[in-house]
Amino acid sequence: MDRTVAFAEELLTRRSGAQVRLADAEDLGGSTRSRVVRVRVSENPFSLPRSLVVKHYLGAPDQADGTDRADPFPYEAASCQLFTALPAEDRATPTLYANDPERRLLVLEDLGRCSTLADKLDGDDPKAAERALLGASRALGNLQAVTAAREGDFGALLRRSGVRHWRDPLADDARSALAEVPDLLAHLLRVEAAPAAVAHARSASSLLGGTEYRAFSPSEVSPENCLLTGAGARFLDFEWGCFRDVALTAASVRLPFPGWGRAAVLPTGMAEAMAASWQSEVSGVWPELADPTVSGPRHLAATTLWVWVCTRTLLPGVVGRGAGPDQVVVGRPTERAAAVLASYWRRLRTDADRQHVDAPVGLADAVVAALEPYGGDEPLPPFPAFSRCTSRP
């Protein structure tokens, strides 16, 4: 931690041209790839705030991730630069104060000791949890609305960091899932995916290309990385920030939160309310998305891709065949993994039934039934805040 603070002091001093001192370092955690530290600015010749957050990527770029994926640091740096350039009222992220690509260091605004969305879901106030979910969904929609025309800016920022061809990890994983899941279902669950169901899933890959509905996405949306500040929800952690079709982001909220991997469910109707909050923001940019005949099939396609990606990751472990492939966008439940996976397929069935698309309905029914011997029929508990609710509070 001392090394991280020393690097941050040196960076800020170099940027300001006068000595900056940092003190009282507090470890905020991080991941296997990075360390996150809160520091007090004890010697401040200019107008830096009283405290800052420093994120330091550990190891060399080719050691930062145990997979064959690209280095995540340039993606987070470009994401923070993109949002810092926006007007303050459009910025749903911390401000970036300094960035050192060589030492893989970011110095960010300290948003304070706020509750996270995860804290509200794990609390005991259903009304507060509902407000937090709807506020976060609305903030996510606004984040996408204000970045709708900025993919070129994001690409330019990545190129300045040496990234010539940027990738969306969900798109990579989805293409692999579309190729592999039919065989996985057949070999591990003895479920034969009908040709119509496979064709429907593969048609959803149209969302992975250059659609007209692309905007910034944090890559995986986790309640642990959503701070609830006095100015509204703020998002953290853009290690794989990217541009993708907005339906894919909305679907990840409705599942809910496959990147978090919590074995819990939302009250009946909450997913739809969250989608409506998100849509109220993006429809200002794309008015046609307020039309269910336009948005409905797109949400179904996005849900299909997410469920297939989650199946590729989780199914081998569910049936005792070892862990599936590691994926940036899918969290592994620590318990009730079969029930979590079954809940994703039920969500897909619900969406397909509403769109009167039969092929995914039949496949979802077969998968849910095949997961029962592994615990797929075990009821998932509600998030603690909703433990006394059967529907929206």
Please provide the spans of the model-predicted regions.
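Conserved short submotifs of the Hanks-type protein kinase catalytic core
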Residues: 103-115
